[in-house]
Amino acid sequence: MTPKERLADNFKVIERENNTLMSNNQDKNILTKSVLLAVLVIGSSFTCGAETQIWQIDPNHTAAQFSVRHLGISTVRGMFEKTSGTVVFDPSDPAKASIDATIDATTFNSRVQMRDNDVRSPHFLDVAKYPTITFKSTRTEVAGTGTLKITGDLTIHGVTKQVVLDVEGPSPAIKDPMMGNLRIGANATTKINRNDFGITTMPGIVGDDIQIVLDVELTRPAK
């Protein structure tokens, strides 16, 4: 039962008790029932707020992956190896979800050292000047069963643009049998144009569109 449904049930009880109070002339019963009503109302308030959960991104089980066309004939793939951040999520009201995530741009890895050094250089990401990539959500919409559209501000190379993440999940929470904490997972995708972020090096050689895939695992302590 969702918090809204529990609240509605509690108010039905309150209405029934009010009707009883009106027809009951015994002071003791009136006092007892009044206390009951107060407890129900207060309990409803706490219950409605109890569903909000704060989850931490697990860097060891999260991958920020990208793909980009090379010369228009093949695709280069890689990843950033360290992602951190916080997700606030209410299972009963997914539209209230929010994300504040940071990617360590210095961990760029495409499995070719020369290329990785070039991408980290001022030619592309300039990680010495802009060591992080950040995403902060501004709006969340339920797109369907188990799917969300999360709009937010993505900052790369010192430039901030609005993007939309298509999210599958989060999954139901499970308890980690080894660590004892709770875990959920989600997958998010989006596409950006690197030129929008002031990264214009090697046109025609490196594609403009960057496909981004985020496989995220989140954790929080078990109650």
Task: Go through each PLM region and give its residues.
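Low-complexity, acidic/polar, glycine-enriched regions of mature
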Residues: 49-223
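Bacterial N-terminal signal peptides
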Residues: 34-45
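N-terminal amphipathic/basic-hydrophobic helices that include classical n-h-c signal peptides
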Residues: 1-21
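Bacterial N-terminal signal peptides that target proteins for export
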Residues: 23-35
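The N-terminal extracellular segments of secreted preproproteins, especially immediately downstream
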Residues: 22, 45-47
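Short, basic/polar N-terminal leader/transit segment immediately after the initiator methionine
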Residues: 3-5, 24-27, 52-53
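Short helix-onset patch at the extreme N-terminus, typifying the N->h transition
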Residues: 7-8, 27-30, 214
